[in-house]
Amino acid sequence: MQNFTFRNPTKLIFGRGQIEQLKEEVPKYGKKVLLVYGGGSIKRNGLYDEVMSLLTDIGAEVVELPGVEPNPRLSTVKKGVDICRREGIEFLLAVGGGSVIDCTKAIAAGAKFDGDPWEFITKKATVTEALPFGTVLTLAATGSEMNAGSVITNWETKEKYGWGSPVTFPQFSILDPTYTMTVPKDHTVYGIVDMMSHVFEQYFHHTPNTPLQDRMCEAVLKTVIEAAPKLVDDLENYELRETIMYSGTIALNGFLQMGVRGDWATHDIEHAVSAVYDIPHAGGLAILFPNWMKHVLDENVSRFAQLAVRVFDVDPTGKTERDVALEGIERLRAFWSSLGAPSRLADYGIGEENLELMADKAMAFGEFGRFKTLNRDDVLAILRASL
């Protein structure tokens, strides 16, 4: 394995009723709070009233930023930065899923940055400080509640990029599975695809001697595969929501990537697709990932065969290693389809008309990917296979 240094300062507060911990945690950082949330689901399920009541109890002065988009936009980040500066915000509280948290990270950094936030999002500048923030998670998917990463879309230029900084870890994150029980089936499935994709990005590498990392990844995948079909048939099952929520956090909080270097090419391609078409991120991943896998298979057939046998229970008897690997990829595709995830870009009405544009967007920073370095022809081939 590779040398590594691990650090994750986020305090994770997990379980039923843990929302009460807001009264303990928020006062550590100040009274002037920016409450960031999305399209209004937290008002429909009662969480908004609960949070506001707790913040009132501790004497917090709350300013609100509602309406964060599913693919959070630079314009919303800038709006939040302006509020922070104008109102003297001391602490931000993100109540929502990964998009709300990602947006909050960019606002927290932007409020302390002398310049356009797009500069650090596109890695042309570095942030050295950020306002403190915490999260209350309502959707198990991205892992943003316990990492420093964020993805922001510039809708005007049709660009979407991931970024991160050591200063953009949440101070704390409250994870009560109860608040995910009203998430509808389609978004539940998107979350499942997203967390599995995060594991795949860290599983596909060429680093030797990573038996524990491999088994940890495989354990998360097996756990999700066992729980997911039950959950989509029983959306209000607390134990299943609990399992999926914890899995999503573990999938991208740094535990699985210690000593390895993941790939992340599929995410980069999907960012280009959803920058142009504004489709759900995980929907794009469900379509692209099996096709990326088939495209890069011959870079390390053994690793794909290992996944097929250990995670998808492919029987290798009498089969070539490559056939085992291919069967594993098709079992993944079939599993996601069985949950109701999309399998073709056509499912979103996407055809060939913008393939070249999406390839150009994906190649904005040059060739990418570590498992196999992808050039423009590779990206186009994966996109065409995904139509």
UniProtKB/Swiss-Prot annotation:
The keyword Transcription does not apply. NAD(+) binds at residues 98-102, 138-141. Its EC number is 1.1.1.192. Gene3D superfamilies: 3.40.50.1970, Dehydroquinate synthase-like - alpha domain (1.20.1090.10). One of its GO terms (cellular component) is cytosol. GO terms for molecular function: alcohol dehydrogenase (NADP+) activity; butanol dehydrogenase (NAD+) activity; long-chain-alcohol dehydrogenase activity; metal ion binding; methylglyoxal reductase (NADPH) (acetol producing) activity. The keyword Heme does not apply. It catalyses: a long-chain primary fatty alcohol + 2 NAD(+) + H2O = a long-chain fatty acid + 2 NADH + 3 H(+). Optimum pH is 8.0. InterPro entries: ADH_Fe/GldA, ADH_Fe_C, ADH_Fe_CS, BDH-like. It holds the Pfam family Fe-ADH. Optimum temperature is 60 degrees Celsius. It is an enzyme of class 1 (oxidoreductase). Keywords: NAD, Oxidoreductase. CDD domains: BDH. Belongs to the iron-containing alcohol dehydrogenase family. Long-chain alkyl alcohol dehydrogenase that can oxidize a broad range of alkyl alcohols from methanol to 1-triacontanol (C1 to C30) as well as 1,3-propanediol and acetaldehyde. Oxidizes isopropyl alcohol, isoamylol, acetone, octanal and decanal. The best substrate is 1-octanol. PANTHER family: ALCOHOL DEHYDROGENASE YQHD. Homodimer. This is Long-chain-alcohol dehydrogenase 2.
